[in-house]
Every structure is written in C-alpha cells, then in structure tokens.
C-alpha cells in the first residue's frame, strides 16, 4: 500500500535546477525500486492510493518508465486509484495499458486474490454521498478498501466520512492524500491507514517515508510500515540566543544536525534573541553548512 508519489511535481523552490532534477529522478526511481521489491518479495498486488501524478505536469518519458516497470513485473498487479491531483486520461493517453495495471473508476470495483478482496472507488461529486450505500464486502476473506481523501465527519469530494465506513466489515482501509504514515482503529474489526508518500519533497514532509507491507496468512492480516526513501528531510530548531558570531552559530547548527546522513536534506530553524551588533547573515550561514548535506535551507 503506497500513495502520493506526485511524479514530476515542482521541487523545493530554493533548490538549484540540478538538485531539483536529481530529486525528481529519485522519486521516479523510488517507484521503480518498489516494483523490484514487490517482484522479489512475491507481493501479489500493489495498492496505489492516489496522486501518483501531479496534474498535467507529468512527462511522457515518466509515463513510459512507469509502464515499462509494470510490464517488467507481470506477476504483480498494480491497483491504481486516481487522486485529486491525478489526470489519468491525460497521463495514459496514447499508451497501451499493461494487463497487470488495474484502474479503479468512479464506480466501485473489486479485485479478488487468494483470501483477499480489494475494493476501491474514486470520489467525485456524483458519488460522494452514495458510495457509502453499497460498499463491497465478501464473507470469509480479508476485505481491503482503498480511497483517496482527508478523513472527517462529512461526505464530500475531498472528505471521507469515516463514520459511514465503520462496521462494514472492512479489515484495512488503505488511504492516500496525507503524506505522513499514520494508522488508527476504524472499528473492532479493522484499521484505517495512510501510507504517506514514498519520498519527501518539501520540509512539510519530514521523517521516514515509504509504504505499508500487508501480509495475509490463514485469514489473518498483518501490516508493517517499510521505510523506503533514498533521502530524508529534517527540520532542525537551533536556539542562537546570546551568540554573537556567524561562526558560533554555524558550529551550533552543525552540532544540532550531528548524526544526520550527508545525503539528506536539512532546514535549520533559527530562534532566540540576537544582539543587533551580531551581524547575522543567513545566506552566509547557509554557505557555511551547505556542503554538509544534499540540500540546506536556513530560516
């Protein structure tokens, strides 16, 4: 279960063109690595819970890479549910869709595997209320439902009415839209889970990113978050009260970031009262530490 790749989306505005290009390529390659992981570990199906793309920004070569990776792993099904940022009509125009790429639509669709059924629907204005009236369910198997949106208490295009999904026999509700992994009880039978994104893109997406591995054995479902990103993003608060020199501040920044791998991305958040005579220079501080990590931002 993964979601929210946002392929070819704009990167952090303060990145260099080269850094932004590198990150876009890495995000695409994270999905390619995911397909290899799935094939190697005998994963039967990958749930893509929305926002794989980012509107019409997606490049033809990106679509080609994604579809080629799907074709290279024919024993894995990819169950793709479009999200609010997706435009599948545009993305897949003039492309042959591999048989193992299964697309959900604005009507409920269900895919059956050994002891598991996976159902999903793309929420729109026409079905935002009615979709809760006929949620698919099959007795004697694990029932997984996938949706894209923000959980809440209303039924809307952008909001999933959690109360109307309770006590419907759902064992696992696979969600997309929130870019951080989280899980909560749905009812006595199941949980709802946001897988988060595969790779963080901005400093509002810090921490481990990856996917959720679901294992079903003897009618029992287990789930595990698998960190998978090639880089992490970090926000590091640094109290610079009483410091008067840029060199002192940079040393405190380095100490605060100790232990963070050099390939990661770091945003330093400076706080505290500074003497007006200190001649604090944010751009200079950024230059002092930028070689320590893939990307550095100082605020």
Q: What does each of the following model-derived ranges do?
A:
Residues 1-65:
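N-terminal active-site segment of His-dependent metallophosphoesterases
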Residues 218-299:
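Accessory, non-catalytic peripheral segments of nucleic-acid enzymes
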Residues 28, 32-39, 64-67, 132-134, ...:
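Amphipathic, non-transmembrane alpha-helical secondary structure
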Residues 49, 176, 269-271:
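Conserved residues at the C-terminal ends of beta-strands
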Residues 18, 45, 54-193, 197-210, ...:
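His/Asp/Glu-rich metal-coordinating catalytic cores
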Residues 38-42, 138-140, 259-261:
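Glycine-rich phosphate-binding loop signature in dinucleotide/nucleotide-binding domains
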Residues 53, 86, 272-276:
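Short, internal active-site loops enriched in acidic
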């Amino acid at each position: 279960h993964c979601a929210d790749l946002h392929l070819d989306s704009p990167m952090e505005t303060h990145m260099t063109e080269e850094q932004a290009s590198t990150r876009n390529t890495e995000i695409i390659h994270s999905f390619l690595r995911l397909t290899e992981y799935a094939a190697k570990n005998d994963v039967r199906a990958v749930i893509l819970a929305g926002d794989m793309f980012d509107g019409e920004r997606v490049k033809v070569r990106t679509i080609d890479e994604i579809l080629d990776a799907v074709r290279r792993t024919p024993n894995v099904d990819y169950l793709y549910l479009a999200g609010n940022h997706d435009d599948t009509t545009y993305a897949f125009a003039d492309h042959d869709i591999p048989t193992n790429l299964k697309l959900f639509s604005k009507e409920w669709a269900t895919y059956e595997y050994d002891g598991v059924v996976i159902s999903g629907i793309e929420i729109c204005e026409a079905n935002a209320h009615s979709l809760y009236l006929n949620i698919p369910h099959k007795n004697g198997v694990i029932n997984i439902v996938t949706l894209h949106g923000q959980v809440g208490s209303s039924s809307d295009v952008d909001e999933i009415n959690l109360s109307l999904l309770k006590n419907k026999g759902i064992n696992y509700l696979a969600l997309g839209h929130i870019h951080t992994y989280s899980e909560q009880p749905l009812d006595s039978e199941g949980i709802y889970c946001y897988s988060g994104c595969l790779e963080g893109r901005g400093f509002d997406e810090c921490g481990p990113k990856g996917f959720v591995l679901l294992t079903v054995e003897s009618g029992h479902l287990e789930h595990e978050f698998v960190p998978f990103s090639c880089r992490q993003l970090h926000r590091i608060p640094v109290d610079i009260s009483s410091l008067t020199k840029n060199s002192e501040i940079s040393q405190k920044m380095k100490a605060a970031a100790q232990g963070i791998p050099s390939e990661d991305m770091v945003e330093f958040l400076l706080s505290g009262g500074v003497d007006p005579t200190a001649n604090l220079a944010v751009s200079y501080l950024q230059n002092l530490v930028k070689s320590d990590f893939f990307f550095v931002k100082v605020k």
